[in-house]
A protein has these predicted regions:
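Helix-rich, typically C-terminal accessory recognition domains appended to large enzymatic cores
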Residues: 1-143
Length: 143
């Protein structure tokens, strides 16, 4: 693999995007433990991001089993940047501004659940930053 300034800059930008997304999630946290509510209590955007994340996890696992590391990493990158950060976090901001509402608490749960999942998928590729962020978040029981 050749060294590339462009790839280094892209990797730095991605790490920065991940760090800022985690800061946003942590800044809006009032929960101590992640417990996803029943599906009937989830907003449409929550169902969408959870479904998208589950598809991502299946894709990453399948690609890693086939030793398609680059394909797996590209899928995580695209999901994190384009889906989670650019869409879901933007959609979540309105609900997170509704302090003390059920929608706010559910949004915190989903935000934290998906971010924890992204960090687990990214950990083999970016162990130091993912460990630092993961250790600062609440988790599912037994995580």
């Amino acid at each position: 693999m050749r060294f590339s300034d462009e790839k280094m800059e892209a990797a730095r930008n991605f790490a920065n995007k991940l760090w800022n997304a985690s800061r946003f999630v942590r800044m809006n946290l009032t929960i101590d433990e992640v417990r996803l509510p029943n599906a009937d209590r989830l907003a449409l955007e929550d169902k969408w991001i959870l479904h998208s994340f589950n598809r991502l996890a299946e894709s990453v696992n399948a690609n890693l089993e086939k030793y398609e590391v680059g394909v797996a990493l590209a899928a995580i990158y695209e999901f994190t940047w384009d889906v989670f950060c650019d869409w879901y976090i933007e959609l979540a901001k309105a609900r997170l501004n509704e302090k003390e509402s059920e929608g706010n608490r559910i949004c915190q749960q989903v935000n934290t659940y998906v971010l924890n999942g992204i960090l687990k998928l990214l950990h083999p590729f970016m162990p130091f930053i993912t460990e630092e962020i993961f250790s600062s978040l609440p988790h599912l029981p037994g995580d």
